[in-house]
């Protein structure tokens, strides 16, 4: 009980297990911290699951909802569906819970998660949730789950050429339905998806205007997922415009907004946003370590959006001119994920492979992939993958293959190249200068001093050292000492 009061829930479960207090263990796993408890120590849950089974079905059925939610975000849908069907069957045959509409509504939310490859089915499931819930809202699921698919939500749901507008409209319905059952704000979602459509189809001015509008609408609403996604579009637009100072101001504001986030899904999403735009600029040292080193396990498990991680690493390989690795990344992006196709990453994969094959001297293959990319893009006018890779793609268009679609992209590519060049015009592209004290502090950091030693050398409190280090990291757009030192050396 002491451990529980101290919020040391894993210890509490261990002690309750020794005491064979299965009722209290079930209550912990059913409570508001149950899902996080399972996420932190799934093995412990499995070790007590059989013992709490009886009391769970008597009093705490939400234990299985929390476990099912955990499994739905960690495992392949085909591995989770048998468990889902088993639990649904248990509920339907249980004398207490079979007529509990609220419990069935929560199960339908989980079903919508498992249907993430089919937006139409997801919307149908959420309609049933409303029928079960009435005016009530989910007590289990937070609105940050909507971040599935962002940084570019359409990356996940756009699964057939010629259906982009239709998918955008379905996304609007899904977002509003999900917000309704999770007490989230419904403000701005229509405009957000309109901005995403504009971005994908190259209407940069409209994308920028709408993304800023939605950001302002939600900045005070604690609607973190839509804020992060708006910054993704805004920062990409600022690169296109070549607005360096506004870009770094945007990065700093995003850092301020997300600094205290603890939810893994949102942390990964924010790191994806910054990672991609930094990769576009070739600023590897500012990217999170897992993106720099192509370790995408968490990206895949947390938001089922491994393609965004691949696109980011591909951009980095373009900058580093590692054509063999770029070709491998492009190939991976073209492999169906969870038995479905994702058109936007597939197009980008074709573009990556066209660039890679051209630079490795295989013009026949380069032509095949660029034609494939155009074929998939033409009906919906998907042009952003070509624009953002225009610097490397330009010689392919000039020397291997072109057509009316590609010719129409040349003004966009020229504008994007100019934007990139404005960022690289001055070697020191960090507009935030360190103070005299911060410079002195960083000299000690580079020399290998510990924080306590720096405190003694500079005659300042340890907490002041830590505060100044945090300020330096923020100004440089990095997260640790090693990256800060690399930035200063550069």
What is the meaning of each model-derived region?
Residues 33, 49-53, 85-96, 127-140, ...:
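Amphipathic alpha-helical segments of tetratricopeptide repeats
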Residues 350-419:
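General nucleic-acid-binding
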């Amino acid at each position: 009980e002491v451990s529980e009061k101290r919020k040391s829930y894993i210890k509490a479960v261990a002690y309750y297990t020794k005491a064979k207090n299965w009722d209290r263990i079930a209550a912990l796993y059913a409570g508001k911290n149950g899902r996080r408890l399972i996420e932190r120590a799934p093995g412990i849950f499995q070790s007590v699951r059989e013992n709490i089974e009886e009391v769970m079905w008597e009093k705490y059925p939400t234990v299985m909802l929390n476990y099912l939610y955990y499994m739905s975000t960690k495992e392949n849908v085909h591995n989770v569906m048998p468990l889902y069907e088993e639990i649904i069957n248990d509920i339907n045959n249980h004398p207490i819970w079979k007529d509990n509409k609220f419990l069935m509504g929560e199960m339908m939310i989980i079903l919508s998660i498992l249907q993430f490859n089919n937006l139409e089915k997801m919307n149908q499931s959420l309609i049933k949730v409303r029928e079960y819930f009435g005016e009530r809202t989910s007590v289990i699921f937070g609105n940050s789950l909507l971040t599935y698919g962002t940084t570019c939500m359409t990356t996940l749901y756009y699964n057939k050429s010629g259906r982009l507008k239709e998918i955008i409209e379905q996304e609007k319905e899904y977002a509003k339905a999900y917000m309704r059952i999770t007490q989230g704000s419904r403000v701005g979602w229509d405009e957000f998806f309109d901005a995403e459509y504009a971005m994908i189809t190259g209407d940069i001015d409209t994308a920028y205007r709408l993304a800023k509008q939605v950001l302002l609408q939600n900045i005070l609403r604690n609607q973190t997922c839509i804020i992060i996604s708006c910054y993704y579009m805004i920062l990409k637009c600022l690169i296109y415009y070549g607005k360096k100072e506004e870009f770094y101001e945007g990065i700093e504001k995003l850092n301020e907004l997300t600094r205290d986030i603890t939810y893994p899904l949102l942390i990964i999403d924010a790191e994806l946003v910054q990672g991609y735009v930094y990769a576009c600029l070739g600023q590897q040292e500012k990217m999170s370590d897992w993106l720099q080193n192509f370790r995408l396990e968490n990206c895949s498990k947390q938001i089922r959006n491994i393609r965004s991680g691949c696109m980011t690493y591909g951009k980095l390989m373009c900058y580093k001119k590692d054509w063999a690795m770029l070709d491998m990344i492009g190939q991976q992006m073209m492999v169906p994920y969870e038995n479905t196709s994702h058109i936007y990453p597939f197009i980008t994969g074709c573009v990556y492979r066209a660039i890679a094959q051209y630079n490795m001297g295989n013009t026949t293959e380069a032509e095949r992939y660029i034609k494939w990319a155009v074929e998939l893009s033409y009906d919906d006018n998907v042009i952003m993958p070509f624009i953002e890779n225009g610097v490397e793609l330009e010689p392919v268009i000039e020397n291997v293959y072109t057509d009316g679609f590609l010719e129409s992209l040349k003004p966009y590519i020229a504008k994007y190249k100019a934007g990139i060049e404005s960022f690289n015009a001055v070697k020191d592209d960090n507009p935030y200068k360190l103070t005299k004290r911060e410079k002195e502090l960083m000299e000690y950091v580079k020399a290998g001093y510990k924080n306590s030693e720096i405190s003694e050398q500079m005659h300042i409190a340890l907490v002041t050292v830590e505060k100044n280090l945090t300020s330096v990291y923020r100004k440089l757009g990095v997260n640790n000492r090693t990256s800060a030192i690399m930035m200063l050396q550069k």
